[in-house]
């Protein structure tokens, strides 16, 4: 399956191609990764904040999920991002961006640029959403947001070394 986005948010529970996820919210982005994995980005704004989750599945089996919670409004940035992994799964990156962003790219420890699948602007959340799996054996070290080829925001490598230990970080 090619990565896809939804022009409108889709229910996260019981809607094809989305398996029943242990999360509330709506699906905004879906894509495939290595080893038969599928990722689904869901968004929930029912608590007055915006909870953005990346869920990983293999077929109908839910494997893992994690994400971030924050204000519905951007404060001094156009990029909010998350990167993580668990156990034997590859790294994943996910971002929430302002409408002006036209491209999101993660650069790995080996110098590979991975372009994230980017949703259209979703007015109900005031954001665009992006996600991608990172190639096997590589780790996301920097993430940048671009507008028409010009970098407008970056999120450098966190304080941990790249690649960090697989346990205790991410999912």
Regions found by a protein language model. Name each.
Residues 1-90, 153-154, 159-166:
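Solvent-exposed, non-transmembrane segments of extracytoplasmic/periplasmic domains
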Residues 86-91, 98-171:
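Ser/Thr-rich low-complexity repeats and stalk/linker segments
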């Amino acid at each position: 399956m090619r990565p896809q986005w939804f022009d409108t948010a889709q229910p996260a529970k019981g809607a094809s191609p989305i398996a029943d996820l242990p999360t509330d919210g709506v699906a905004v982005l879906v894509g495939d990764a290595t080893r038969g994995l599928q990722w689904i980005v869901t968004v929930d704004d029912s608590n007055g904040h915006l909870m953005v989750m990346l869920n990983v599945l293999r077929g109908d089996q839910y494997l893992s999920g994690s994400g971030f919670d924050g204000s519905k409004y951007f404060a001094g940035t156009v990029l909010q991002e998350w990167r993580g992994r668990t156990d034997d799964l590859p790294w994943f990156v996910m971002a929430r961006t302002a409408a002006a962003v036209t491209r999101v790219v993660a650069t790995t420890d080996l110098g590979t640029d991975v372009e994230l699948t980017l949703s259209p602007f979703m007015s109900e959340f005031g954001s665009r959403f992006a996600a991608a799996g990172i190639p096997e054996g590589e780790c996301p070290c920097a993430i940048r947001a671009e507008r028409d080829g010009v970098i407008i925001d970056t999120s450098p490598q966190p304080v941990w070394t790249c690649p960090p230990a697989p346990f205790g970080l991410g999912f």
